[in-house]
Amino acid sequence: MLTICTQVPSEFQTQVPSFANPPTLTMAVTDFIARLKARTSTPSDADLGMDAGIQAVFSDAPAGIPGNQHLESPELAMAYLKSIYGPLKRHYDWFRRTQRGQIKQYARTARSRTEAYRWRGRSQMHVLTSGMDDYPRGPPHAGELHLDLISWMGYFTKTMKDIAGFVGETEDEASFIEIEKAIVQNLDGN
């Protein structure tokens, strides 16, 4: 039987607890929340008084599209988001802790002294953790920062802010707002 490990060079198979990959799964959560907000902010046909004769025509239609239950039920959506919030927040905190870059050690000027990041697991030829291992980069330096990771952290922070706001974690939401602002200011240089 052919396994994935036989196709990947052994030096790329090792997993290290401080190496992170882009938090791409948060994109699905961001989209889910956007779809929830779109559903709740748009008035239904019944709200607009336009459902009178339509129900009879579609009375044999299924109640909902399979897989959309969480979008159709605010209670299910809230329960789901609350169930993933804690583990996702732990992952976010781990990401910030393990991928933090150095600013003051290299006399850099930045609005925020804490919101700078660099990929760990860098070699002379590869930055496998970034997801762009063939992207050309200069020789590694202990003080380097990575724009792609700083941008990912801005996106991850925005996702966490949106979830916190949606599930009522107002203190966390306020914290994420400040972190997001600091990341954006560091990216903009303002």
Feature locations, PLM:
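A structural signal for well-ordered alpha-helical segments within the folded catalytic domains
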Residues: P23, M27-T30, G86-K89, L147, ...
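Catalytic cores of carbohydrate-active enzymes
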Residues: R96-R113, S151-N190
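Tryptophan-centric aromatic hotspots in well-structured domains and transmembrane helices
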Residues: M1, Q13, M27, H91-Q99, ...
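Alpha-helix capping and helix-loop boundary segments enriched in small/acidic/polar residues
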Residues: F12-A20, E75, A79, R137-S151, ...
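Secondary-structure transition/capping motifs at alpha-helix termini
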Residues: F32-R39, T170, N190
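Substrate-binding groove/exosite segments of carbohydrate-active enzymes
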Residues: M1-T30, A34, S41, L145-L147
